[in-house]
């Protein structure tokens, strides 16, 4: 049980409407344990607090209002406002982030509304946001709606109409492969192949100033976005956010769909560029739609997402642990925020041009630290990682609003780019999952359908052979159909080695009668 101390709200700090300091963070007064380390705002065990936040966030998202044109608010705006529509359009990776998070969330909760929402978002982007098949950069998604309530995505927030971001296109392609595996709908596979083919057609070998694809490019003319500032011309020729694109290519190769030889060749070229440049220089480059081309920035999301990709692909290099550890070290050294050391936590700033600690960035860094611990056995930062996750709970209000510290309620950072980090942290360390519930935490396949009941957990997935990790804290496994099982009763962790697309786990109640479903 956690012994709690509460820092009073009125200790002379300069409180704004949502102050952020070591006494109060966004919505809540800071709580600490007996040793002075930050704990979740609710005062609960982290496993309880994380689960509560995840459920509240999903509930807020799915019940968000529609805009005047009948389109869900989260498909047209990057920032939530309760009484009026924000003047800004979609976040650059907003749909991709939500698709990635909801894929994990569906396995965790089994709520059929989750895949329905995923289908709605993917279909809307495919139908209202792709570049023309006859464009130079064809069949790629535009990341922004320049006419906010037009119902169409047609450009880039800073570069303007006609521009797109190839890294976000690669991410969408990877999510379309996942959605094809989930639903069996060939339109998603077709969309992924078209994105991959378009990217292959424009890849370059790259150098220290040019990535294999630019960050912003005009779909019709091929012009890389430019901006002049203080007499100097800047070009949007560089970013390092290519691990999702590598996932797109490998996903299509595994399915034997599209020009797999060209995908393999392009992936090898991109991998070589990453190893030669960003891994060697820590020049991670831009990611965010609202940062102008002239304001070059190195971002936590690009760096730590690459570290996660490397850890999940042991054949990437002989030195995966050292490379991933080096990236995590750079993120901490360059973007660690030391304003909260009184409560024994160092959250992570967003990027070099915006040195403000973020709910999404801090929780992502923490989840990758826990993955690093799981894969390498080096767990020196494990305690700090959990405190980072605890710190990021304070941005979530009881009703599921999730506000970026010192900023707005971003539908990127607070939703799609938040939930996934807690679910991945639970998968690496199941002790962070609820102690009285049953949940699927991880699969090497894609879940197509899952149902939880007191007597059994049954799920269907894309691949026959796969590995699943579950936390069974409400039940005890009796038997499994469709695979073999290994039960760790002390950790309440069940590992399934599946040999069938359909798996059913028969359950027994816990002897102590505790647990809920």
Name every feature range the model reports, one short phrase each.
Residues 1-6:
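Bacterial N-terminal signal peptides
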Residues 8-12:
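Boundary at the C-terminal end of the N-terminal hydrophobic targeting segment
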Residues 13-93, 112-159, 194, 198, ...:
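Low-complexity, Ser/Thr/Pro/Gly-enriched N-terminal "stalk/linker" regions
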Residues 13-69, 120, 176, 182, ...:
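Terminal, non-catalytic domain-edge segments
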Residues 70-90, 136-163, 209-243, 281-308, ...:
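Carbohydrate-binding/catalytic loop surfaces
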Residues 87-108, 120-121, 174-178:
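Non-membrane alpha-helical segments in proteins
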Residues 170, 177, 185-279:
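Solenoidal tandem-repeat scaffolds enriched in leucines and small polar residues
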Residues 471-484:
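Solvent-exposed beta-hairpin/edge-strand motifs
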């Amino acid at each position: 049980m956690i012994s709690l101390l509460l820092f009073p709200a009125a200790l002379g700090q300069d409180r704004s409407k949502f102050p952020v300091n070591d006494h109060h963070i966004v919505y809540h007064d800071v709580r600490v344990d007996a040793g002075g380390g930050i704990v979740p705002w609710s005062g609960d065990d982290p496993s309880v607090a994380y689960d509560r936040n995840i459920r509240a966030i999903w509930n807020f998202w799915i019940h968000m209002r529609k805009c005047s044109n009948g389109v869900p608010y989260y498909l047209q705006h990057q920032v939530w406002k309760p009484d009026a529509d924000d003047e800004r359009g979609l976040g650059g990776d907003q749909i991709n982030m939500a698709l990635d998070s909801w894929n994990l969330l569906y396995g965790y909760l089994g709520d059929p509304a989750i895949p329905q929402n995923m289908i709605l978002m993917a279909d809307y982007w495919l139908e209202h946001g792709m570049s023309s098949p006859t464009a130079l950069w064809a069949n790629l998604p535009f990341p922004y709606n320049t006419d906010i309530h037009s119902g169409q995505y047609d450009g880039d927030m800073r570069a303007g109409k006609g521009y797109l971001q190839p890294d976000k296109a690669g991410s969408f392609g990877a999510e379309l492969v996942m959605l094809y595996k989930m639903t069996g709908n060939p339109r998603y596979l077709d969309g992924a192949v078209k994105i991959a083919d378009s990217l292959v057609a424009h890849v370059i070998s790259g150098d220290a100033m040019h990535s294999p694809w630019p960050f912003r490019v005009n779909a019709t003319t091929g012009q890389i976005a430019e901006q002049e500032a203080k007499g100097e011309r800047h070009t949007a020729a560089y970013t390092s956010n290519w691990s999702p694109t590598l996932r797109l290519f490998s996903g299509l190769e595994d399915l034997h769909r599209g020009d797999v030889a060209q995908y393999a060749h392009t992936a090898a070229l991109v991998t070589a560029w990453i190893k030669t440049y960003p891994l060697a220089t820590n020049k991670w480059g831009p990611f965010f739609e609202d940062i102008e081309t002239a304001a070059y920035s190195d971002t936590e999301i690009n760096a730590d997402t690459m570290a996660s990709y490397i850890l999940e692909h042991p054949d990437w290099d002989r030195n995966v642990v050292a490379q991933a550890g080096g990236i995590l070290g750079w993120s901490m050294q360059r973007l660690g925020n030391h304003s909260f050391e009184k409560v024994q936590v160092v959250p992570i700033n967003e990027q070099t041009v915006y040195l403000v600690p973020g709910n999404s960035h801090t929780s992502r860094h923490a989840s990758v630290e826990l993955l690093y611990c799981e894969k390498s056995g080096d767990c020196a930062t494990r305690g700090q990682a959990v405190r980072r996750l605890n710190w990021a709970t304070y941005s979530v209000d009881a009703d599921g609003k999730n506000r970026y510290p010192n900023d707005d309620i971003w539908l990127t950072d607070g939703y799609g780019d938040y939930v996934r980090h807690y679910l991945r942290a639970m998968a690496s360390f199941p002790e962070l999952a609820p102690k009285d519930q049953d949940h699927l935490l991880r699969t090497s396949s894609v879940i197509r359908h899952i149902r939880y009941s007191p007597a059994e957990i049954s799920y269907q997935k894309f691949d026959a052979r796969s590995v699943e990790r579950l936390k069974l804290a409400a039940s005890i496994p009796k038997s499994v159909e469709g695979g073999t099982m290994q039960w760790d009763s002390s950790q309440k962790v069940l590992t399934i080695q599946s040999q069938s697309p359909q798996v059913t786990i028969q359950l027994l109640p816990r002897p102590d009668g505790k647990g809920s479903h």
